[in-house]
Amino acid sequence: MSKRIKRLRLMAEYKSTGIFVESPRPLIGEISHDHLNISPELSEAIFRWIDEFDSWLNWDDPMNSPSVPEKEINRFNKQGEELMKQLQKELGPSIKVRYVPTK
């Protein structure tokens, strides 16, 4: 990869890797965990987190998905913040990572 990743965001998005490049512009978008130097344990934890998010959607009829209790969303967001901290730690200071909470 000729351009170096400068900024990432961790966010829950349906059927995604959960990690998105924010900078530089030519690389913006979802990125595979395989392209990052992260542990298999962290990668698996992020995928489990995304799987939980995916489970909230009624895939046959998305408009009739059940509402998720605020307490559950708060717990999910705390877990996302912890995953973001671990991701930042594993990637080091050369890549900035931010978390976008689920609403």
Regions found by a protein language model. Name each.
Residues 1-103:
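Intrinsic low-complexity, intrinsically disordered or marginally ordered coil/linker segments
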